[in-house]
Amino acid sequence: MLRLVGCFGKFNKVGFCFFVMAMKEVLKSELELISVSDEEVSRLEGVALDFIKSLKKRGLTAYIGGSLAKGTLIVKEKQDIDIFVVFDYSEDILKLEKILKKMKLPGELKLVHGSRDYFHVDCGDVVLEVVPVVENKDPELAENVTDVSLSHVRYVKGEVLKNPKIADEIKFAKAFCRANRCYGAEGYIRGFSGYSLEILVIYFGGFEKFLKGIRKKNVIDPMKYFKSDREIMRELNANKLQGPLVVVDPTYKFRNVCAGLGLLTFEKFLEVSEKFLKSPSLDFFKRREVDVKGMKEFALKKKAKFLELEFRTDRQEGDIAGTKMNKFFRFFVKELAKNEQGVLRVEFDYSGVGKKAKGYLVVLEKNEVEVCGPSIGLEEQAVKFCEGKGNAVFKKKGFWWWRKRVSVDRVLEFVKGFEKEMGAMVREVKSGK
C-alpha cells in the first residue's frame, strides 16, 4: 500500500504526491521484474566469450555488442546476443559462412537475409546473432549501417559510465515499448530500435522525462551538430525524413536513427504513454495482445464493419516474411482510404515466427462515392465519359461526375490481384470459421 508521507495540504498537492509515489512504486516493481541477475549476465557473457574465442582460433576478431555490452539488457524468454565479427574489407565477409559451417557450434546455424546477411546460432534459451561488419573510422564511408554498430556501443557505454542510473531508465523504455508493440526496427513493426530508445532516454534524462518530452519535440539533435531544426531538415537525406520523428545519430550526424519509425506505431506509442503518465500501473509493462473483442465491440458501437484478414507468404520467416505481409496489409488500408472507406482502427499481428500473419480493421463502409470526370466544356471527352458510365453520371460545378459503387469486399478483391507482386496472399477470416 502506498503511503503519502508529508503530502498534506491542498488537494492538488496531495494528488501530485500520490502520483509521484505511485510512479516510483510502479517503476521500482518493474525494475525487479525486468532486471537480469548478475549471475545470468555472467552466464550470457560466458556463452558469448566462448564463441568469440572459437572465432579467434580461426583468425577472426569479434566483440560482444547490443544490450549485453551496453548494460541495458532486460529479461526475455529468449535472449539474443549480438556478436560483431570485424573484417578489414567487405570481400572478406564471404569467408564467415564457410568458417561457421566448419566450427563446432553451441547451437543450430541459420542464415538470415537482410541489408547484409548475418547468422543465428540458436542455443536454446539464447540466440547468438553473428553480424559481419567492416571496420571503418569514418561513418560517412560505411558501406552498411551495421558497420557503425560498434560506435553505437561505445557511445551508449560512455553515457552509462557517466550516469550509471540511466541504464535502468533505458530498461524501462525497452520493456514499455516491447509490451505495447512499439519496439523493433523490423519492417513489419516499424517501431523504435533499441539504439534509438537508448539515445532518447539519455537525451531526455530518464524514462518518464522521455515519455513527456517526446510529445513536445519531434526533431532532436543530442550532440548539437546543427544550428537549427531547419538546417537538419535541409542537410539530411529526404528519404530519412519521412517518419514522424527525426533523431540525429550522435555517432554520425547525417543519419536519422528513427527513419524507420512508422506514423501509426508512433501515434499508438503516444496514446499509451499518455495513459501511463496519467495513471501509472504495471499493466502497461505487460505484453499487449491485439484486443479483437474490443475491436468488435467498437465496430458494433460505430455501426461499422469488423474485418479479420489472414496473410501468408513463402518468404523467409522473420523480418522478410513479416515485412512482405505488413506491406500488403498497408496497401489494402491505403486502397480503402482511396475509395473513401472510413478506416477507424487498424492492427497488424505477426509473431516474428512462421509465415502467417493477421490483420484486423474496423471500417465505416460506404456503398457509393462520387468520382469527378471531364469538364462539361470538353465535349468529346464528356461524350466518351457519359457513354462509358451510363446512368450513373451527373453534372456538378461545371464537371461531369460518376457515382461509383464501392465496398470493402470490392477493394479486397481488387488488392488480391496484386498478390504475386506483393509476395504474399490474403483471405478474409469469416466469423465462426
Regions picked out by a protein language model, each given a short descriptive name:
Residues 15-76, 92-94, 119, 133-139, ...:
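N-terminal regions immediately upstream of nucleotidyltransferase
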Residues 90-97, 209-212, 369-371:
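Short, conserved charged micro-motifs
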Residues 97-141, 336, 344-357:
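Conserved catalytic core of two-metal-ion nucleotidyltransferases
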Residues 126-180, 205:
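Internal, well-ordered alpha/beta segment that forms a basic, Gly-enriched binding/recognition surface
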Residues 165-348:
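Conserved nucleotidyltransferase catalytic core and NTase-mimicking acidic/glycine-rich helix/loop elements
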Residues 347-433:
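Extended, charged low-complexity segments
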